[in-house]
UniProtKB/Swiss-Prot annotation:
Belongs to the complex I 23 kDa subunit family. [4Fe-4S] cluster 1 binds at residues 61, 64, 67, 110. HAMAP family: NDH1_NuoI. The keyword DNA repair does not apply. Its cofactor is [4Fe-4S] cluster. This is NADH-quinone oxidoreductase subunit I. It is an enzyme of class 7 (translocase). The keyword NAD applies.
Amino acid sequence: MMKLKEFFINIISIFRSVYMVGMQAFSKRETYMYPDVACKLSSRYRGRIVLTRDSAGHERCVACNLCAVSCPVGCISLKKSENSEGRWYPEFFRINFSRCIFCGMCEEACPTAAIQLISDFEMSDYKRSDLVYEKSDLLISGPGKYKNYDFYQISGVKYSNKYKKESSFEEKPISVKTILP
């Protein structure tokens, strides 16, 4: 009697398994075939780093080195140089994407909005040396996310013919010698 009961339980179990496999075989897929179907990324997705230009077409980067200091893995290196007008620019700007963790700290630290993270994530390569991007690889032709922001219009730049004038609401600086007893 026990053997007959086990036999029917095993038969029912087999049919149930075949039914479940058949239902899953013809149902909608949960996974997407990646190269054929593009992934939908969030608007705040942090992908590859790019260097942007201002509205005049100049590089926004002033080589302040804040991005390299704020990078937790130290994948950014640059060297500051100065042109004839007194404007700073990076002589070289290098990012090692094999070390980059795409945290966005460099983008937050950049005062000129020169560094921006875009939604490009397809960066795999066979050689690590090909993942070291130079300034020419990183520079894009447009302003990126912040189209109207111009660092030099806000902060100024040292030009020989530019002078600083006092504002009407600004108080005169206090002289330390006059307040001493």
